[in-house]
């Protein structure tokens, strides 16, 4: 079978589905030809990575993608439950036109020294820049503005960021106050 999506006029339903019930998949492991439905808690450490045509996480259930694990979705993601991507875990949505609905929580941990800056980019919108590192003073949160003049007479400079992150836009945040300049913490 092939992974199909709906057109404007006709929906071709050739995609089989498999449902996770907390213990096993109803129709074999998901693959790029199947809709994967999470109807029981799923953790990639215990149950493994998977690929699917589209993914549905039902209300009341949690999908945890752990460090060094992945879930690859060819098309659409509908999250009505809880979806957590932990540090160094990966959620990959292949189709640029794929629809992504629901909230996703990403955890990222950076090992930094006091004067280090970490570059962040928001794959999803709606996260407060100040929440990246609550112990870092707000005047060390920056975003790039390509339209203002810089001290060298060119265009583009860093400006203070005290806003909600926008998808695909980059930010830099300094390490929290109290961190050492000599040792990673």
Map each language-model feature to its residues.
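N-terminal exported-region signature
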Residues: 7, 16-185
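Short, exposed coil/turn segments at beta-strand boundaries within extracellular/luminal domains
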Residues: 1-7
């Amino acid at each position: 079978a092939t992974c199909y999506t709906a057109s404007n006029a006709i929906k071709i339903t050739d995609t089989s589905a498999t449902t996770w019930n907390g213990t096993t998949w109803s129709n074999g492991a998901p693959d790029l030809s199947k809709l994967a439905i999470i109807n029981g808690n799923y953790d990639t450490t215990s149950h493994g990575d998977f690929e699917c045509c589209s993914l549905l996480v039902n209300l009341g259930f949690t999908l945890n993608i752990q460090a060094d694990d992945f879930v690859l979705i060819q098309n659409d993601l509908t999250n009505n439950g809880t979806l957590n991507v932990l540090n160094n875990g990966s959620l990959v949505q292949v189709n640029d036109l794929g629809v992504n609905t629901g909230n996703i929580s990403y955890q990222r941990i950076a090992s930094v020294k006091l004067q280090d800056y970490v570059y962040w980019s928001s794959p999803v919108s709606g996260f407060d820049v100040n929440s990246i590192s609550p112990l870092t003073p707000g005047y060390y949160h920056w975003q790039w503005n390509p339209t203002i003049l810089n001290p060298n007479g060119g265009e583009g400079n860093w400006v203070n960021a005290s806003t909600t992150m926008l998808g695909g836009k980059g930010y830099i945040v300094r390490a929290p106050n109290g961190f050492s300049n000599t040792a990673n913490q």
